């Protein structure tokens, strides 16, 4: 009897796999390029000092103030003909400070200002960078690799999520250099 149950079990297992059928196929494509640029020493760990502003200037949700430019300097960039990469930008990595709803950085200062975040923007100071998104959806402008040195220009500003209160504002974000 045990022999029959064993054989029936084997037959059942074999026949169940025969009923599986593929519903589709996924193909993955990518490209690996030489690292075409190096971040300069002074750009590796930046500190961007935002201006001191009045809490009144951030009196309601969506208000922004204190637009402050910053740059990431790259050196030793190879030409696109050598590497296959023609453009470069910073990809701002999501972390514990990322507000996935607004796409901004939350304030991590102890006893800091409330209802205040830090918003990153492209060089134009208008188009917001949406943190917490995939690279293509972050809306980060790319820069052509035309020279051995490339400057990536961005901006940061205060962003109100409600009526702001006074206090310090601090946050951090890591970045990776991405090539296209």
From Swiss-Prot:
**Cleaved signal peptide residues:** 1-21
Q: List the disulfide bonds.
A: 37-77
> Is the keyword Phosphoprotein in the record?
no
Subcellular location, principal = other
Q: Could you tell me which Gene3D superfamilies the record lists for this protein?
A: Fimbrial-type adhesion domain
UniProt cross-references to InterPro entries, sorted A to Z: Adhesion_dom_fimbrial_sf, Adhesion_dom_sf, Bact_Fimbrial_Adh_Pro, FimA-like
**Stored Pfam families:** FimA
Biological processes, Gene Ontology terms: cell adhesion involved in single-species biofilm formation
Q: Which domain of life is it from?
A: Bacteria
Keywords tagged on the record: Disulfide bond, Fimbrium, Signal
Protein location: Fimbrium
Q: What does this protein do?
A: Fimbriae (also called pili), polar filaments radiating from the surface of the bacterium to a length of 0.5-1.5 micrometers and numbering 100-300 per cell, enable bacteria to colonize the epithelium of specific host organs.
Family affiliation: Belongs to the fimbrial protein family.
Identify the PANTHER family for this entry.
FIMBRIAL SUBUNIT ELFA (PTHR33420:SF3), FIMBRIAL SUBUNIT ELFA-RELATED (PTHR33420)
What protein am I looking at?
F17 fimbrial protein
Q: Which gene carries the instructions for this protein? A: F17a-A
